[in-house]
Amino acid sequence: MSKMTPQEMAQTIGSGLLSFPVTPFKADYSFDEATYRANMDWLCGYDVAGLFAAGGTGEFFSLTPTEVPQIVKIAVEETKGRVPVLAGTGYGTAIAREIAVGAEKAGADGLLLLPPYLTHSEQDGLAAHVEAVCAAVKIGVIVYNRDNAILQPDTLARLAERCPNLVGYKDGIGDIELMTRVYTKLGDRLTYIGGLPTAETFALPYLDMGVTTYSSAVFNFVPEFATNFYAAVRKRDHATIHAGLKDFILPLIAIRNRKKGYAVSIIKAGMKVIGRDSGPVRPPLTDLTEQEIAELTALVKKLPAIRSSQQAAE
């Protein structure tokens, strides 16, 4: 069980960079525990404020409800209290509660509640869903505002009153007006996380709206670049930020946007590039082509910080 209160967890993750480690698979798509343990231990060596086990980049949508707590338990064992471990949960309310309870028992310090599966509902229904998950556990819960689960400011305010362990809000839609209204309504009651794909692109403008942290997928394979970029964001170092966007993030996005599902696949490919092969993505996602991996390799090799990452993998 976690030793952190929901408020302590929220304060901690709001103070630094976050990431969602990939979930390694073997050639037969079974979970590769040894590689996952090695990756988690390696990532903890960098300046990261929280790691989300079995999150979106960790292919939560392709994991079974029993796999999630197993993966969380391993993450907790390998991080050894160095950073908070948060777990993904989602689908319908009953399954989300089941996964949440299992993750809490496995030692998770918090939860990220992903949108319900292919279900559109009114605010009252979304609120009931969030409240049910919050009531099932004592650890902190972060809601992910995205796609078919967009909570409005008034709904969030009501939930914040009823659910003491609702401590975070992750934005995955990029609606500047909505983000502003949410922050204006709830202020410091929640910790705010930037959660758009390749969140580095939006990090600086979001910082000015009270969003002090974001989830970096590229931290998986270029952790030094990711942490240096985050430091530049917090310092509002425009020159360093725009250089990082121009030289790495935007070219990476160009590869990512070629096919649906590549937001996860390109991160797995990046792990292969630096010598930390974490296997294939599970269907229905598809892996990058050899040509695309070659392009990504060339892009990664241009980063000075990648040398130490490659050496660490050897």
From Swiss-Prot:
Keyword annotations of the record: Lyase
EC code: 4.2.1.41
Catalytic activity: 5-dehydro-4-deoxy-D-glucarate + H(+) = 2,5-dioxopentanoate + CO2 + H2O
Molecular function via GO: 4-hydroxy-tetrahydrodipicolinate synthase activity; 5-dehydro-4-deoxyglucarate dehydratase activity
InterPro entries the record matches: Aldolase_TIM (IPR013785), DapA-like (IPR002220), Dehydro-deoxyglucarate_dehyd (IPR017655)
Domain of life: Bacteria
SUPFAM superfamilies: Aldolase (SSF51569)
Residues annotated as transmembrane: none
GO biological process: D-glucarate catabolic process
Keyword Iron: no
Keyword match Lyase: yes
Top-level enzyme category: lyase
Pfam families: DHDPS (PF00701)
Pathway: Carbohydrate acid metabolism; D-glucarate degradation; 2,5-dioxopentanoate from D-glucarate: step 2/2
Signal peptide location: none
Similarity comment: family membership: Belongs to the DapA family.
PANTHER family found in the cross-reference section: 5-DEHYDRO-4-DEOXYGLUCARATE DEHYDRATASE 2-RELATED (PTHR12128:SF19), DIHYDRODIPICOLINATE SYNTHASE (PTHR12128)
Stated name of the protein: Probable 5-dehydro-4-deoxyglucarate dehydratase
